């Protein structure tokens, strides 16, 4: 079962990639519905490209989340992980003049993974899973961040992510820091299958 799958339309005919060779791939829309395991595997295997919803409602949802965080920052509100540390450091407030620097510093701090690197397929699964989570509209991220993750998947520019590193409630801070590091140009990536 592939959820959210659409086919590119040429005139009156809907076609899939098998009908026209390697010219295009089917597109999986990520954001309005949860992805199935089969969806994640298909994107990881590069059987599908991904896209974000075009609906006004979805785009407004994403913008409202980002606007909410921006307003809370202007009001100098306390936002876990934005104006505070993470985990046991959640009670440590970050001075407002350092708030914009915190995400970069946290990605560097948590970039302490060990072990073998995840293979390209597994790293792609990590990226599409995070994209799906963020694109649901509950995280306050910008549309431009989501668009960059879509670009990474569709262009097959995927962060190199070590296989070991996180322990904790979510267990994902270390691997996700490698996505953030790649987004700002500070981490290695797989480009066309090679590091």
Model-assigned labels for residue ranges:
Residues 3-5:
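A cross-taxon signal for low-complexity, glycine/charged-rich
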Residues 13-16, 25:
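Intrinsically disordered, low-complexity polyampholyte segments enriched for Lys and acidic residues
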Residues 7-10:
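Aromatic (phenylalanine/tyrosine) cluster motif
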